Amino acid sequence: MTSREASQAPLEFGGPLGVAALLILLPATMFHLLLAARSGPARLLALPAYLPGLEELWSPWALLLLFIWLGLQVALYLLPARKVAEGLELKDKSRLRYPINGFQALVLTALLMGLGVSVGLPLGALPGMLLPLAFATTLTSFIFSLLLYAKALVAPASALAPGGNSGNSMYDFFLGRELNPRLGSFDFKYFCELRPGLIGWVFINLALLMQEAELRGSPSLAMWLVNGFQLLYVGDALWYEESVLTTMDIIHDGFGFMLVFGDLAWVPFTYSLQAQFLLYHPQPLGLPMALLICLLKVIGYYIFRGANSQKNTFRKNPSDPSVAGLETIPTATGRQLLVSGWWGMVRHPNYLGDLIMALAWSLPCGLSHLLPYFYVLYFTALLVHREARDEQQCLQKYGRAWQEYCKRVPYRIIPYVY
């Protein structure tokens, strides 16, 4: 891919002006949510009562804790993996290799945390450090993204991402200029995608649960549900880690600030919003309502896992008895498009399951505040945007076959609605 070819790729997110705004708005939104969760009114759309000064945001101890956490996850990444998988073929016809040991990293981290707590590690004190930790992670994300951009300037043209080589420095810094930046066999994007932020989310939640137990004698039922639901989500992502190798993040998007900040900062500090809210604003939750919420979670997970497993099984072995009878549409690339089963219901059934699960882990926070539902609102917008990007990519890749698929499966995410 030449620079000229890349510069003709359509710009996303409003081009350079849009990404300039996002460079400010994304961190600002994250800090707004952190402050709103601990404020008395807990209003999503109101400005915080106060803005913390630098002395509240900056802490060398928070930076040290962040680096210890990242170092631990790097060490766990480098341990022998139960499996090494190959990614999709790159433009130079090569395939990169990836260790599949994310679930192992989650379990080992849990064991180390359990050992630490047993000898006096004050994990329950972590909620009081969320602001300086978020600040340290944001600062690290900017610096890391700059280093990645500098590295990409000397990368060969074949290593560049389709959309991050526009020629505009700010735009390319945000989207990511290099597709798979590596140091030896260590893949920065793959590591960040599912490790430090996703596992960090689980342990921030756990720290909030422990802090609630210290304050009120025991964790609330709502806090248990949020922790359990989100642990299942993270555990599923890491157990099926290999499936991330076919996602847009890995095969299409460069590794720039968008993914760096999203993976390292946005995920752990905003996805834990429900647990943060419950610590400062406890909500009553009866057993009947809890059971209904659990049922909703099970339905969402059933759709999410069923759709993803069906797709992954078909990709690996179309002759597998569980998918051999499904109807398909042939494409010019030689691949087949599923047009029955989960993928005949809507074009993105996994997104539907994702949204139902997001609603399920927000409902334990009650209906008195909009703030805990930020994730549902944000995730809906994210998936609609991602679905539009998917549609464009699939139309370019499959042409008439994709048009035929869209005729056969008219609904994108929600049956009979969208």
From Swiss-Prot:
It is a multi-pass membrane protein. Disruption phenotype: Mice develop normally, appear healthy and are fertile. NADP(+) binds at residues 311, 315, 338, 343, 350-351, 390, 394-398, 405. Pathway: Steroid biosynthesis; cholesterol biosynthesis. It is found in: Endoplasmic reticulum membrane; Microsome membrane. It catalyses: 4,4-dimethyl-5alpha-cholesta-8,24-dien-3beta-ol + NADP(+) = 4,4-dimethyl-5alpha-cholesta-8,14,24-trien-3beta-ol + NADPH + H(+); 5alpha-cholest-8,14-dien-3beta-ol + NADPH + H(+) = 5alpha-cholest-8-en-3beta-ol + NADP(+); 4,4-dimethyl-8,14-cholestadien-3beta-ol + NADPH + H(+) = 4,4-dimethyl-5alpha-cholest-8-en-3beta-ol + NADP(+). One of its GO terms (molecular function) is Delta14-sterol reductase activity. It comes from the Eukaryota. GO terms for cellular component: endoplasmic reticulum membrane; organelle membrane; receptor complex. The chain crosses the membrane at residues 13-35, 62-81, 102-124, 129-148, 255-277, 287-304, 355-377. Its EC number is 1.3.1.70. It is an enzyme of class 1 (oxidoreductase). One of its GO terms (biological process) is cholesterol biosynthetic process. Pfam families: ERG4_ERG24 (PF01222). Keywords: Cholesterol biosynthesis, Cholesterol metabolism, Endoplasmic reticulum, Lipid biosynthesis, Lipid metabolism, Membrane, Microsome, NADP, Oxidoreductase, Steroid biosynthesis, Steroid metabolism, Sterol biosynthesis, Sterol metabolism, Transmembrane, Transmembrane helix. Strongly expressed in liver, weaker in ovary, testis, kidney and brain. PANTHER family: DELTA(14)-STEROL REDUCTASE (PTHR21257), DELTA(14)-STEROL REDUCTASE TM7SF2 (PTHR21257:SF52). Belongs to the ERG4/ERG24 family. Catalyzes the reduction of the C14-unsaturated bond of lanosterol, as part of the metabolic pathway leading to cholesterol biosynthesis. This is Delta(14)-sterol reductase TM7SF2. It comes from Mus musculus.
